[in-house]
A protein has these predicted regions:
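Carbohydrate transferase catalytic cores enriched for Leloir-type hexosyltransferases
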Residues: 1-272
Length: 272
């Protein structure tokens, strides 16, 4: 309802604002409400510089404040980690993991193509994609089906997994792939860093600013470059150590205490 009180809206990413045809009616209704709030002078809290840049294009007169989100809690060595049942036959083969709902922006079909190229040079390497079904599930399955039978057997689409499963995947993977076409922040990047996991990421969205130097960044539309990066991250031990060290440092840059204090400062500024 209309109010003269100061208002703050938080925007984590702009995918739904930019791609309404790929969103549900509920999501699009929420985006209409968000637009109204911003157009009636609500202050916008953006979770990254990338998100803020897009918002400035959409809402040139809006006041936008950039406040990063915090890092996920580190999983302790004693925390429960369970192998997903769907991977029981994979044995101890090395694998690259990608975690997230199967949405178009996750770019999973190209990841499968790139993996197939990289896997020709790494005979036992596997790819595990863990995430709920989404608007790109059919194209992802088509990408897997287009591979040779032997190569397709090395791609594991395991669907939604439990938190214990995620802990196991991060602990056991050789690397994480995050070739998204857009991300407003990217919690999986920080989760991978907390697990000391090397990352292959995309040059788009917030991925460069959140990952810092803890990831190999490539054009997500360039399948060959993505394949080369996947190969390098699993075969080059010196590179892996460099990425792991950078990740440990980068992870320390994010904390919920810092996020909370910056939000409190923003709220105080608005009411005073």
């Amino acid at each position: 309802p209309p109010t003269k009180l100061p208002r703050v809206v938080t925007v984590y990413d702009c995918w739904a604002l930019l791609n309404p045809a790929q969103c549900s009616s509920i999501t699009n209704d929420a985006m209409k409400a968000l637009r109204r709030a911003i157009q009636t002078e609500a202050v916008v809290h953006a979770s990254s510089h990338a998100t803020a840049a897009t918002l400035r294009e959409l809402f040139p007169t809006a006041r936008i404040e950039i406040i990063y989100l915090g890092a996920p809690e580190r999983r302790s060595a004693s925390s429960r980690k369970t192998r997903p049942d769907a991977l029981s036959a994979m044995g101890d083969a090395p694998f690259i993991v990608a975690i997230g709902t199967v949405e178009k922006r996750k770019n999973y079909p190209r990841l499968v193509e790139a993996f197939a190229l990289a896997a020709h040079e790494n005979s036992d390497l596997q790819l595990v994609i863990a995430g709920s079904a989404g608007d790109d599930s059919d194209l992802l399955q088509q990408a897997v089906d287009s591979l040779s039978p032997k190569m397709a057997e090395r791609v594991h689409l395991i669907g939604r997994v439990t938190d214990d499963n995620i802990g196991w995947l991060y602990q056991q993977a050789a690397a994480m792939a995050y070739p998204s076409l857009d991300e407003g922040f990217g919690f999986p990047l920080l989760e991978a860093m907390s697990a000391n996991l090397p990352i292959v990421g995309s040059t788009l969205g917030s991925i460069p600013e959140v990952s810092g130097t803890a990831a190999i960044l490539v054009d997500p539309f360039d399948v060959s470059a993505l394949a080369e990066a996947l190969t390098n991250v699993v075969t080059n031990s010196e590179l892996r150590i460099k990425l792991q060290s950078a990740g440990a440092t980068q992870f320390q840059s994010f904390s919920w205490e810092k996020t909370a204090q910056q939000l409190v400062n923003l709220y105080n500024d608005l009411v005073n």
